[in-house]
């Protein structure tokens, strides 16, 4: 017997209607913000945005603070060039596994606890920098401080949770870009802190040690603010509360989530190419001050101030990368996002080569470094205009894997060209290292041509006929999980993701089509004595159905 259609998600519709009164921006069907007003601190969307980038900013400051004071630390601990280079490799190696693990953590307990725990657990390592006595302790402490770079995953996951798919590239890029500024800010801030302590009467060999109490203390402060002010979900509640209430469906067993993320080849390609945008940025953050100090005979304060320019360009460069991604997606869809990434990152590789070729001129070096930083950092932002669409169910795992690719690229590149330990590195200058790093960047960006989404296509080929967003995202769920209603977030995301077809795509979006997994889930539900509508109505967000 047919029933009168009943509107599902009534509370969500009511919330969306009230959004203009409650928030200074509109919300989408998932409660995510359709706009990112960075000057506001509105709960929960904008407060999460600001807490995420501030925590990430501090992780960069602490990780690269030793590189900012490298000439001073090198002389005090009697470190060789190769030892200093290996310590730099250790700093970025720490976060490789940590970023993948953090992806699992945020998928399970939410970004707020993940961010706060990261800051509190690595703060002791920052303080311990004051106690190092030789290369082994110095490298060990840098390794453990570098673990905090997994904050990147919390930052991107949190923003991806709070902002609509049409602006998620911009929001992710702004937050990550402002966080990345810490890599430049530390080159400016740490020499000033060191000099201020030294001018206060503290000997130089002690002053650099005292300087590390500043970022260590700020670690604890930011973790406390995150716990007190942060909120995990657009609903205004934390993950654990939503799971207790049943409002936020569990993602099922952990292994299927990990399998979805690691088993998607697109994740690995983006991890590889991110290693030569963000990885290149990390490498430059590690070596630029020492390069300017030694190559041009500058004092530490001047070398630090000039080196800081590269990282401080993140104030707008990474954000513009995300904006470019969202802008080209409007007419060209996902294919436009991938093309833009390939073009920008290739240009970054070209200017990296040029940077190594102008090593005899300080003015030319600074100008080319600025241009190089623009393309390199825009490419970072462009990556996370694509990453959220690889997997809805395993978004945290994919973000962690791609982020880990950045650290892996930095570790490999620095070990090959800048560590000073291999035989060929004995006669290799840092300028030559920049040239070869640029060549690697150009070559290892080419795999982007192999990324293909069945519903959107690739850089050179179109979509598969009849492919729909619902099919792609629903394949991550089994029939039993669908019958349990665990897939609902993926279905809503699939509907929002139709915007990635681009306005030039002539396919009509039309009504939501029931994917194969959903039909199987309905049969499973019916076989267990339930009603088909318990799957269809809740999943499609449409009106009710009949028996």
From Swiss-Prot:
InterPro entries tied to this protein: MFS, MFS_trans_sf, NO3_transporter, NO3_transporter_NarK/NarU-like
Q: Could you tell me the keywords of this UniProt record? A: Cell membrane, Membrane, Nitrate assimilation, Transmembrane, Transmembrane helix, Transport
Membrane topology designation: Multi-pass membrane protein
Query: Where do the TM regions start and end?
Result: 53-73, 86-106, 113-133, 143-163, 173-193, 211-231, 262-280, 296-316, 338-358, 366-386, 400-420, 433-453
Family matches, as Gene3D superfamilies: MFS general substrate transporter like domains (1.20.1250.20)
- Molecular function as annotated in GO: nitrate transmembrane transporter activity; nitrite transmembrane transporter activity
Q: Which cysteines are joined by disulfide bonds?
A: none
Q: Name one Pfam family in it.
A: MFS_1
- Name its cellular compartments: Cell membrane
The residues the entry assigns to the signal sequence are: none
Q: What does this protein do?
A: Involved in nitrate transport, but does not seem to be able to mediate transport by its own. Acts as a dual component transporter with NAR2 (system 1). Imports nitrate with high affinity when expressed with NAR2 in a heterologous system (Xenopus oocytes). Involved in a high affinity and a high capacity transport specific for both nitrate and nitrite.
Q: Which PANTHER family does this one have?
A: HIGH-AFFINITY NITRATE TRANSPORTER 2.3
**What is the protein name given in its UniProt record?**
Nitrate transporter 2.1
Name its species.
Chlamydomonas reinhardtii (Chlamydomonas smithii)
